[in-house]
Amino acid sequence: MFRDSPREPTREGVLRAARKIAALLPPTPLLPIEIGGVRVHAKADVLQPIGAFKIRGAWHRLTDLTPDEAKAGVIAVSSGNHAQGVAWAARELGIAAAIVMPADAPKVKLAATRALGAEVVLYDRAGGEDRDAIANALCDERGRVLVHAYADPWVIEGQGSMGIEISAQLGQEPSRIIVCCGGGGLTAGLALACPLSAIHPVEPDGWDDMKLSLERGEIVRVGPNPPKTICDAIQTPSTAPVNFAVLKGRAEPGVSVSDAEVRAAQRFAFDRLHLVVEPGGAAALAAALAGKVPLDPATVITLTGGNTDAEQFAAMLTATA
């Protein structure tokens, strides 16, 4: 399923990625917020140019391509946010990009990826098509580099740049970071960036493969008939060896959240922080609000993406909780 990783991600790589990101983009805000009588902080990566943290890993990976690799172009797999990150970086660097995306991805994400100039190759997620097999075949056919959404050491390091920013803004490493977790790219990156912080991955109910993997000490895939979830951005069947090697024995036990808890978190972020946060980007906040992770004043919650269809978001806000 996953191609062998060419190397392991390192904290030195995270620091190098952070310097590259700092030269390109301003830090996203670290916002104080009170939950259950405790003042914590929320890292608002919803305010990145593409509306999500994925720009970090994409920029670090594409700027490390060799001249021949850059000339050939890249392939990526994504439900939307990594797609936009790769497309944005590719446009800035003049690199061709083709993105394998599920046909049922939010329309706003499909449109934004195409608007950034990337080729979009659709696959049937609901029908069980193997997105990684499609991407690997395209790489072999076109002689391109695969920029995996999470199973890539450069991507992991790039996502970890968020942790370097957080520590600088907070004036210390956080006591704990509550992380929206799909494949584990951001989770692993933050574990490398903040070695003194407890790392709490949060996944949708029924898509909690990281939680199960950490419990059993080996990679576990989502079951054959997982439930539907509104958290499309972190709807991932399994983590990858390169991510799990970082997180095994390092991350705290994972937790999962329901769609109702996620919607409550989206409303909370809109009401208290005046931010539009997509379902997958609100999972960590949902866990905090539901009391599933302990909080203290040095806790940081990641708000990882804000790319959601306007009509669906408006309907969610006005619906009875």
Regions found by a protein language model. Name each.
Residues 1-321:
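PLP-dependent amino-acid enzyme catalytic core
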